[in-house]
Amino acid sequence: MTARWVVDEVAAERDLRITWQPISLLFKNEMTEADEPYPRYLKTHKMLRVMESVRAAVGDAPVGDLYWEYGRRVHHDQDKDFDVADALTAVGLDAVHAAAFEDEAWDAPIRERMAVGIELAGEDIGTPIIGFHDRNGDRRAFFGPVITRVPSPDDSLDMWDSLMTLMNIDGFWELKRTRTERPDFGERP
């Protein structure tokens, strides 16, 4: 949801350049096969391997297209067992990258890219992480925002500008409140 908010409502209005980075909750939460959510986290982790294969072969730009296709299938179609090769071809990418799904060699680049976000945002966070350059040009990142729907265009920009203001204040660290509703993904894009 946060990705949809930033890409659809904020990026063009605030001249943002989006580079998709992986975060594996399997690695972040140090999951083992004994953990109940392990199969779900393993599946999404393997999807990240495919994304890193794509990035290595053709650069950052198509990674976003694949991310959206994954999201359409998982969140809108409720298909958590889709064929990754089908998702690749749906966005014009070579299905050969599907082999990365089972290839543990892609775990190293996932860990390396995750480490950058975690170093900037902190260890006690999850996903999403938004990284940016502050008003002094220093790299910063924060966890969130966690939202259940994409705000209106005006509210989206207000929220972004408010977050950027807060994140530029030294000594500011955290806001939180209990979530009381489930995400509303809207129509399938």
Go through each PLM region and give its residues.
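Structural alpha/beta surface segment adjacent to cysteine/selenocysteine redox centers
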Residues: 1-84, 162-163, 174, 186
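C-terminal cap of thioredoxin/glutaredoxin-like
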Residues: 6-11, 81-189
